[in-house]
Amino acid sequence: MSTSKLQVEEIRERIRTLRIEKGYSQDYMAVMLNISQNAYHKLEKGYTRIHLEKFIDIAKILEIEFPELLNGPDYVYVFSGKYKK
């Protein structure tokens, strides 16, 4: 399964949107991820790659399930037994 550049950009935008909705600053996210604010900024803007482990950590900080981070809130997924519409 390949992830296109557009899909990655959508995920990054979803991360940014959720972060702002929760009222979290980039500084807060960086502290929670144990990285610098500059490093977090680069992750969110797409200047550096986000590794799978960081995606999982970001989902936890944002208090959402990992598949929802990747696919959005309307995604139907079976893995956790949840159905979202």
Describe each region flagged by the PLM.
Residues 1-21:
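A short, Lys/Arg-rich alpha-helix, primarily the initiator
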Residues 1-2, 60, 70-85:
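Short, charged recognition helix plus adjacent turn
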Residues 14, 25, 51-54, 65:
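Residues that mark the N-terminal boundary/hinge immediately upstream of a DNA-recognition element
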Residues 20, 34, 45-47, 74:
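Residue-level detection of the helix-turn-helix DNA-binding "recognition helix"
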Residues 20, 31, 60:
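Alpha-helical residues within the helix-turn-helix
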Residues 23-42:
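Short alpha-helical DNA-recognition segment
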Residues 47-60:
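Short, basic-rich loop-to-helix N-cap that marks the start of a DNA-contacting helix
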